């Protein structure tokens, strides 16, 4: 049914199909075989992107165990969506990883440090260099842990720069929001 839904919505061939690593085999391979045989196309999806599984405190999250963490419930509880995003981005998208109160706390602290560092971001040229390194990390298989490390390093050095221009702050704020979806 997945190949029927995908090809109905996206056509007989499309660029990217994604899902959890647990769907790689046999699910995605069977779906592709069905669609390719039925529609006579060489490849249903040109690329497949499979994410790692996220566990909770060392246990696989599942409906049957009742241990799911819902983003909307975290937001309803007052958690900043940008902190949630940073917590998820702390691990590479293909790697299995764990969600915990510690992961969230670390992400919240990181977000606060980045926001504080915006008051003295460095020169426009320095900020442009940070953004370039951020882009390079994301261009390398969406390496969000490396992207976060780039911004952590910037935030650590920011107080030393003493430079505070609204242009530099706005430039970095816009880049981080655009590239990571994190609001500073």
Q: Model features per residue range: what roles?
A:
Residues 38, 42, 81, 91-184:
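Feature 926 captures the class I aminoacyl-tRNA synthetase adenylation module centered on the KMSKS loop
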Residues 1-122:
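Alpha-helical recognition segments enriched in aromatics with Gly/Pro capping
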């Amino acid at each position: 049914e997945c190949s029927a839904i995908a090809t109905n919505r996206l056509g007989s061939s499309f660029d990217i199909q994604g899902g959890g690593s647990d769907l790689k085999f046999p699910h995605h391979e069977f779906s592709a075989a069905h669609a390719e045989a039925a529609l006579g196309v060489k490849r249903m999806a040109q690329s497949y992107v499979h994410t790692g599984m996220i566990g909770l405190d060392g246990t696989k999250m599942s409906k049957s165990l009742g241990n799911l963490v819902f983003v909307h419930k975290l937001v309803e509880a007052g958690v900043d969506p940008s902190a949630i995003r940073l917590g998820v981005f702390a691990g590479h998208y293909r790697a299995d990883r764990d969600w915990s109160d510690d992961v969230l706390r670390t992400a919240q602290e990181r977000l606060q440090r980045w926001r504080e560092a915006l008051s003295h971001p460095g020169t426009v040229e320095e900020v442009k260099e940070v953004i370039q390194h951020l882009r390079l990390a994301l261009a390398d298989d969406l390496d969000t842990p490396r992207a976060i490390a780039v911004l952590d390093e910037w935030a650590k050095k920011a107080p030393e720069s003493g430079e505070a221009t609204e242009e530099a702050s706005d430039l970095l704020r816009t880049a981080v929001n655009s590239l990571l979806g994190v609001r500073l």
